[in-house]
Each structure stands twice: as C-alpha cells, then as structure tokens.
Amino acid sequence: MTEPGQTTHFGYRDVPLQDKQTLVNDVFHSVASRYDLMNDLMSGGMHRLWKDVMITTLNPPRDDQPFRLLDVAGGTGDISFRAAKASGAGFQATVCDINTDMLEVGRQRAVERHLDGQVEFVEGNAEALQFPDKSYDAYTIAFGIRNVPRIDLALKEAHRVLKPGSRFLCLEFSSVDVPGLAKIYDLFSFKVIPQIGRVVTGDAESYQYLVESIRKFPKPADFGEMMREAGFARVNWQVLSGGIVALHSGWRL
C-alpha cells in the first residue's frame, strides 16, 4: 500500500509514487508502434545480440517437454518470439504487460509469425501478477523492470509465480565501466537518442525519460541484493558491451 506523500523517480524528476505508473503508461502508449524500430536505431541493432544472450542463457528445451515462460513487460513479444524459435513443441509463453498498446502490437506480430497458438498476451501489473503460485518454468523481463514503480514488489511476485528449480532472467541497462566509453555513451544518450525519438515517433520527451531512467536504475550489485531479498538464490549477472547492459540471473530453489 502506498504511504501518503511517498515519492519515486520518473527519470530525473521526483513524482508521487502513485503517479509513476500513469506517467510510464503515457510513454509507452506514445512509442508502441515504433518501439522495436527505435530499439534498433538507439542500439545500432545491438539489442538483438543482447536478447540472443538472454535466450541462450534461458536454454529452453528443444523437444516436446512442457515449458511455460512468463515474459513480463514483454508487450511487443520480441523475447517470447525468440524463445519460441529456440524451443520445441512443448513451449508456451505468456506475455504480461500493463500497456494495452504494446500488447496489441505483440498480438498482431504473433499472428503474422504464426505463433499465436504458443504465445498469449495478457494485460497485468508486474507488482501484482494474477497468476497462481509456482506456475511457470521461467520468468523473463527485458528492459522493463526499471519502469516498475516498486521493483521490490515485482521481484517478490516473480519469485512467487516460479516453480521451485526455475529461473528468473532480467536484461536491463547498466553502468558503463570502460574508460572513455562512458562519455561517448552519455553524449549519444542525452543528445542523440531524444532527437531520434523526435524524428521517428514525434516524441523526444518520452525518450528523454527512457535515457534518464537508465541512469536511475540500481548498479548490478545493488540490484542483485534486491533479488536476494526477494528470495532468489544463486544470484549473478553478466555485463555486456562494456557495461551498457547486464543480464541478471537468479533461481527459485
């Protein structure tokens, strides 16, 4: 329950905690139709390689063994589609996202890819999932958890819905740790990405928020501690591309 007067960050702004989700929703309503194109432009296509690392780490079964994936904040379906391609006939994914526009893009793409029988799309909140305890074989969230107002609640919910022996994977932007790269990365992030957003989507402000939100996300070690506090074991992370992103892993034992 939100305490009166509680605040959180929305990019570099402090906002009432209860207002953040609405503000985040407005961002993704604005960019949904061009979201995947913008990912390509902003990362120079690197997001595809990072997601490939995530799917390789997930290592879903390639036979007909049943495997249920919960892909949270996965609106356009990119992670679930990649996982389906790497899986066997027993694969089923639930894409859960709070944003209806992102989900609609995902549903259309699932039909186009003939994956609508394996990938379902459900509107839901990462902080209060509607799924039963111990019901999924894996949980993925890619570039989404930093937009959740109460990350601690989302992590506890992730732990709750996973079966014992199942894995949590979170792909998220991180802190550049290569000398010289940080300045270049900051220049590109703050000067170039919002302008790409303005040209492609007509919305520079949403991409300014996304850039700022990356800087406010916890360092890998701090996020790892949050995972442990939520109940995850064998917590670790893999830094990619000089620290631009990190793949976080934990297990429900």
Swiss-Prot record:
Pathway: Quinol/quinone metabolism; menaquinone biosynthesis; menaquinol from 1,4-dihydroxy-2-naphthoate: step 2/2; Cofactor biosynthesis; ubiquinone biosynthesis. InterPro entries: SAM-dependent_MTases_sf (IPR029063), UbiE/COQ5_MeTrFase (IPR004033), UbiE/COQ5_MeTrFase_CS (IPR023576). Keywords: Menaquinone biosynthesis, Methyltransferase, S-adenosyl-L-methionine, Transferase, Ubiquinone biosynthesis. It is an enzyme of class 2 (transferase). It holds the Pfam family Ubie_methyltran. One of its GO terms (molecular function) is 2-methoxy-6-polyprenyl-1,4-benzoquinol methyltransferase activity. Its EC number is 2.1.1.163, 2.1.1.201. GO terms for biological process: aerobic respiration; menaquinone biosynthetic process; methylation. The keyword Cytoplasm does not apply. PROSITE patterns: SAM_MT_UBIE, UBIE_1, UBIE_2. It catalyses: a 2-demethylmenaquinol + S-adenosyl-L-methionine = a menaquinol + S-adenosyl-L-homocysteine + H(+); a 2-methoxy-6-(all-trans-polyprenyl)benzene-1,4-diol + S-adenosyl-L-methionine = a 5-methoxy-2-methyl-3-(all-trans-polyprenyl)benzene-1,4-diol + S-adenosyl-L-homocysteine + H(+). Methyltransferase required for the conversion of demethylmenaquinol (DMKH2) to menaquinol (MKH2) and the conversion of 2-polyprenyl-6-methoxy-1,4-benzoquinol (DDMQH2) to 2-polyprenyl-3-methyl-6-methoxy-1,4-benzoquinol (DMQH2). HAMAP family: MenG_UbiE_methyltr (MF_01813). This is Ubiquinone/menaquinone biosynthesis C-methyltransferase UbiE. It comes from Rhodopseudomonas palustris (strain HaA2).
